């Protein structure tokens, strides 16, 4: 089963890159990002199989300062899967039948609309399908995440913010694909800040470089210190206020505070290793904050560390989709000096 799923996931990644087009005779997809239509018999949905599906896909997103699920789920019985729903961006068809010889999932792309993914998950018994989800549920969910990521990346390639992309290329020697709407807010030799402003929210990112002095330069402590140095160039709403990294949170056991350190892991994207940090930003001297994710790697051509740091401010609204679309930026980054 694990071998099947690994082959399946690789195939999904390859096919999804090729299948997400933005000019076709097919109709456009409907639905919001990170929304999945699950077509499943009511009896299955109300039982342990439906419970397992909901637990997997509605797992809370980590490292955002409110509870939001990984995906928003719309359940439809097969008889109601009509009208506009076959054009939805993300569809999971759940089929339990004694005629199924194996428990498996397979993906199809652009079946009715594009860029669309339709996954059929089938098995001979409820028990077999629940066991499959317990073992492979996160990988199954990852297939839909890859599809959402590819839509963002390919959309930015097709309808990019060309002027800002060229500015970044000249300044940092990297190619990046940005959806239109971002405005450059500040820039100097080693720093660039851009944001996309909404009436009640903001998506922003800043890129910065600094010298690499060995492994001590990429410890979490060193990366946070560098982040604070450059984030201080992003002003807050009141005079003298500026962005910084949250470093303490209330202690639930008493009235004091405890140290908070961003989560860290190394990820490999497009052949390049990046140190990913996830945490929260706040404003020194004012009351603002939200989640951030940063990616740092070594530019071997310059022997400097380069960081793409993404943040969201949405005090009254959801943050998941805003942050996810920023995370997808890293998948469109390549170094012009390393080609």
Question: Model regions: which residues?
Answer:
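Short, well-ordered beta-strand elements
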Residues: 117-128, 204-210, 304-313
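C-terminal motif of bacterial Sec signal peptides marking the signal peptidase cleavage site
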Residues: 16-19
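Bacterial N-terminal signal peptides that target proteins for export
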Residues: 1-8
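Signature of long, low-cysteine stretches enriched in small and polar/charged residues
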Residues: 69-128, 235-302
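Secretory pathway targeting signatures of secreted, lumenal, and periplasmic proteins
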Residues: 22, 39-41, 179-246, 251-254
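Solvent-exposed alpha-helical segments and adjacent loops
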Residues: 26-40, 95-162
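Surface-exposed amphipathic alpha-helical segments
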Residues: 130-154, 182, 303-339
